[in-house]
Amino acid sequence: KLILLFTVALMMQSCNITVEVSAYTDYDLTLEQKNNICWTSDTTSLIGLTNDGRIYAVNPNQMKDLLVAKEKALVYRWSPYEMENVIPIYFVQSYCNENNIELYVITNEYKSAFTEINNVKNPMFSMNIDDYITDISYKSENKFYKQLLGNKNKKKYHLYYFENGKCVRTEDKIVNEKKK
């Protein structure tokens, strides 16, 4: 009986691990990549983090605190699978550098994100799915962005412009800051 109980407990624990890893459908991450996903606690501050090659799983309140500390910031909701709206990360980073805007990329997919991580100045982020354990893909992403942006803004865009922590506009295309 003890062995059976231990086996069932181990299987249940394995299921929890699988849920976290498969939340972004990345069954084929290497051990090094899995170890480079940093699951932050609710109280972890993102201010002062540098791009150290890890992806930080964060909640909307952590992102809000980070954005308030920046005069101008751009949050890029990046997904390599949404081909019609994907803007190369290096292009968005270059645009931000030219316009004195801090870029923060939030990815919903890990495998491709690790190939892009060196193209951004700041750390790359993902949603901390522990807070959104329902339907991981669509509903949880909507809930995350609704909390980050407020009820008035929708997740349908990929670029979210912030000034001193306030979302001032959302778009799917890069706009020349000097001409707007």
Predicted features along the sequence, with ranges:
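Sec-dependent signal peptide recognition
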Residues: K1-L5
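C-terminal motif of bacterial Sec signal peptides marking the signal peptidase cleavage site
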Residues: M11-S14
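Bacterial signal peptide processing site
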Residues: N16-V19
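Post-signal peptide N-terminal segment of mature Sec-exported envelope proteins
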Residues: Y24-T44
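Post-signal-peptide N-terminal segment of Sec-exported extracytoplasmic proteins
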Residues: I37-A73, W78
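Short active-site neighborhood of thiol/selenol oxidoreductases, capturing the structured segment around
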Residues: M63-V92, Y104-I106
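Thioredoxin-like thiol-disulfide oxidoreductase module
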Residues: K111-K155
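A short, hydrophobic beta-strand/beta-hairpin element that forms part of a small beta-sheet core
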Residues: K154-E171
